[in-house]
């Protein structure tokens, strides 16, 4: 696929959000900041949450909502920036809210049901302004946390756990009819789907899991963040087999390659929603290309 690099020199970019003014907002996880990219090489730091800002989304209040994973230890390996274990200065995971006019960062929540969030990763709002988000957990020298899928009702102060005990929950998205939540699990290379009875209420797929498996990748491939298409396909960033894997609701999949081992996310924009912005994280680049199908327009934009 043909693409252009519109921004370089970023420190592990993730979470692209396409703004109405044509700019793209990303996080720089290693730099612990949120950056606006103008597409001509110009960048501007708009907020400094610290920790590890990760997934981003515009909320119903017009603010920028942030999954903050608390940070990683990074290694520079042959010119590639590689994230790893939980850092010594880790002070917990949290959901944050950024006022785009001032850059002020507020903590929305850091516990669910009395349990601390470990590494919130990605988030999506439904049309009513309810929030679904994942907790990826943290990795340590000899073990790692389990993670799960969570729900925060619009206007609520406390979230609830929808399902837990997943290896490494990452990207999350809603089907166009908002009857299904899709969740990528990193270490298993598996795409899960959670059917909803109503917002925040899942129909358990089995006595063992709330979700059902849509697809599992062959060989060693890791899933990262994702975006939905208007047709209901899942475009999930894929690590090691660097690129974007498109998965149909029925489980068929195909791969679009990009030149980075750690491709972490994709976002759609443009009048026809076929401009795709892809974060090439280990090389610190933001790429732009034309996608073969329109992306799903998000419920809230700014």
Language-model regions, residue ranges each:
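Sequence-structural signature of mature extracellular/luminal beta-sheet repeat domains
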Residues: 1-302
């Amino acid at each position: 696929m043909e693409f252009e690099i519109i921004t370089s020199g970023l420190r592990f970019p993730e979470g692209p959000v396409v703004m109405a003014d044509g700019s793209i907002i990303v996080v720089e996880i290693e730099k612990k900041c949120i950056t606006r990219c103008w597409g001509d090489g110009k960048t501007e730091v708009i907020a400094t949450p610290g920790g590890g800002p990760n997934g981003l989304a515009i909320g119903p209040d017009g603010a920028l909502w942030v999954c903050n994973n608390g940070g990683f230890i990074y290694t520079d390996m042959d010119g590639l920036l590689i994230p790893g274990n939980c850092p010594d200065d880790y002070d917990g995971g949290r959901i944050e809210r950024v006022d785009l006019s001032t850059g002020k960062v507020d903590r929305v929540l850091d516990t669910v049901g009395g349990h601390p969030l470990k590494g919130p990763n990605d988030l999506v709002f439904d049309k009513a302004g309810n929030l679904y988000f994942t907790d990826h957990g943290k990795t340590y020298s000899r073990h790692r946390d389990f993670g799960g899928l969570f729900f925060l009702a619009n206007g609520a102060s406390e979230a609830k756990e929808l399902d837990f005990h997943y290896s490494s929950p990452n990207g999350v998205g809603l089907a166009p009819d908002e009857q299904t939540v899709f969740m990528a699990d990193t270490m298993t290379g598996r795409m899960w789907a959670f059917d909803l009875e109503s917002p925040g209420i899942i129909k358990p797929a089995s006595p063992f899991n709330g979700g059902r498996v849509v697809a599992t990748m062959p060989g060693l491939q890791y899933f990262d963040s994702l975006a939905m298409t208007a047709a209901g396909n899942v475009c999930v960033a894929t690590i090691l087999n660097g690129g974007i894997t498109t998965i149909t609701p029925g489980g068929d999949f195909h791969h679009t390659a990009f030149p980075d081992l750690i491709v972490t996310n994709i976002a759609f924009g443009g009048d026809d929603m076929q401009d795709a912005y892809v974060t090439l994280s280990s090389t610190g680049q933001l790429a732009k290309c034309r996608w073969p199908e329109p992306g799903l327009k998000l419920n809230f934009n700014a």
